[in-house]
């Protein structure tokens, strides 16, 4: 009996060691698993949607499921983000976001500038800005940040002159000189493309010009360039801006793959801003 005791002790130690090894293996396996996180991002149209689709596959490797929420107008994405229905949005420039914050007590914040949408003036019947006759109607977007943007573009090319102001945005009240007596008709951003046949000229982004078969390089009477604050930007909220999923999304959207995609497919209309 005494001889059996040491043998039993050894057997217990062996079994205990096996049990510990299995537990450690299970723990390591569990720790090795990446918990999947769903990140919802509101957006509107290409190339915004396409850039997010490119980011999807890269985020999958980090255990992040990117849910692209395509909405129908330029109001819903900010409302959805403000109300915490989505985690981020990708459709706007920073002045547009700032105006939303001001009017809605919002806490939206820019994460990363992705590309410049080369703003321009387009006209069906005229090939140069100088050809547009006196008293003509030029359609511009009706939200304050894009009124400002349109007027700055026109001043940049000497079409109008704006008076100095301490206000955040230029409006039509700040037009000091309008030598051709142009009438600037303010319409909803999503209506600009429809105004191409009705107005003498339209000021709009490439995203709305492209369905009409127009590009800034080939058809823009004047264009904006990249020296401005109007890059299309990834936006989140102050409470989640520094979170790992949002930062991973930023990295995925500023990859070499995204840059190459824009250069290959949107060289005239979406200029990388990163």
Give, region by region, the residue ranges found by the protein language model:
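C-terminal motif of bacterial Sec signal peptides marking the signal peptidase cleavage site
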Residues: 13-17
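Bacterial signal peptide processing site
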Residues: 19-22
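Short, well-ordered beta-strand elements
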Residues: 34-46, 64-70, 137-138
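Short helix-initiation/N-cap motifs at beta->coil->alpha
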Residues: 68-79, 167-194
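Alpha-to-beta junction loops
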Residues: 82-92, 136, 159, 180-183, ...
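Ligand-binding "clamshell"
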Residues: 99-111, 126, 198, 203, ...
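A bilobed periplasmic-binding-protein/Venus flytrap-type ligand-binding module shared by bacterial periplasmic
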Residues: 118-130, 231-243
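Periplasmic-binding protein-like
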Residues: 148-155, 253-273
